[in-house]
């Protein structure tokens, strides 16, 4: 839950503030607006996929901890094969025989493919782990994660509009200041909502 909370929190900021983040880091020289748009879309896609990347790694380590390396290995093989298919399906592009895929998402398709496969692998690993340990409260885990996603959506929307309403003359320092203020307020909103909606790990952290 703690890993999901941290990744959704960061992901919501990356998604809502993707354009100004890219402009701040790369927006100079020959890096034009078209390049900014492409990289911003990639940052959004990676923001969506961040929780699944981390959860998959954590679940694999849990299996290693209970001395089961076969299950994550088998699921990884399935994930690799699925990734090959979904790379083709999402990326698309033209060929002498026409469009390779009706979606034709280009470079963004590569990220969405990896995200989908990681989500699939996380789901399989979680069900296998529940079967092995037979004491995981999956319904509570699902409810907690749905609340975390809702909190991430709200805080992300807030950070987007806070950034928009802060008016400062354009400069590198002012852009950095706007990002710090909007993302900082977003973190506070996320934390407060996590307490209100009773996210377990946040409650545990508050006890220390």
Question: Where do the PLM segments sit?
Answer:
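Membrane-embedded alpha-helical bundles of multi-pass transporters/translocases
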Residues: 1-208
């Amino acid at each position: 839950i703690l890993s999901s909370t941290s990744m959704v929190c960061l992901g919501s900021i990356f998604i809502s503030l993707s354009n100004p983040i890219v402009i701040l880091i790369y927006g100079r020289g020959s890096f034009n607006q078209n390049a900014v748009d492409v990289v911003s879309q990639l940052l959004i896609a990676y923001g969506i996929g961040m929780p699944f990347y981390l959860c998959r790694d954590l679940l694999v380590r849990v299996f290693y901890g209970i001395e089961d390396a076969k299950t994550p290995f088998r699921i990884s093989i399935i994930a690799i094969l699925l990734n090959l298919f979904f790379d083709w399906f999402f990326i698309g592009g033209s060929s002498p025989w026409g469009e390779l895929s009706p979606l034709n998402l280009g470079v963004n398709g590569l990220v969405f493919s990896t995200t989908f496969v990681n989500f699939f692998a996380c789901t399989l690993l979680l069900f296998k782990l529940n079967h092995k340990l037979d004491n995981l409260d999956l319904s509570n885990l699902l409810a907690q994660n749905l609340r975390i996603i809702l909190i991430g959506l709200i805080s992300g929307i807030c950070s987007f509009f806070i950034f928009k309403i802060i008016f400062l003359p354009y400069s590198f320092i002012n852009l950095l200041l706007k990002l710090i203020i909007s993302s900082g307020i977003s973190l506070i909103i996320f934390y407060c909502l996590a307490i209100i909606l009773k996210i377990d790990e946040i409650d545990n952290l508050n006890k220390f």
